[in-house]
């Protein structure tokens, strides 16, 4: 047990070290994660938080859920465009994510790689999975670093784990690493 404490502390520090320091106002957004100077993901921002996002230099907002979700803002496109940011939506069904949806997002990112982008969904589960894939495939971030960042928000369920594995396999990337645990979370009660 005595040897476990330093190991747990080291893992905690290494898991959080890949994420950038965050402006406290942005940290108020549900599960906000800053991966680099130009890329972040989050859950659903409020109307007011979109102003904070714009004030922090974001130039593009990509929404990967449906506008009829409980906390969604049906006029988010107008809010974002009204703040002089680009808006893109790729509706991703949480129970059935498709490769074409990920590649639509990735293609948009690759066209303007330096555009400061917030990728968001409802709670940052879809968005962290897409962020994980994008960072590993296009930004050459290690599987272990990207997985640790994703795990600060959630551990993918079977549908999302299989989706992640499919996209990685399509790109000839092995999902395994020494610190990666792809064990499924316990079923919800």
Please place each PLM-identified region on the residue numbering.
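Hydrophobic h-region of N-terminal signal peptides that target proteins for export
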Residues: 8-17
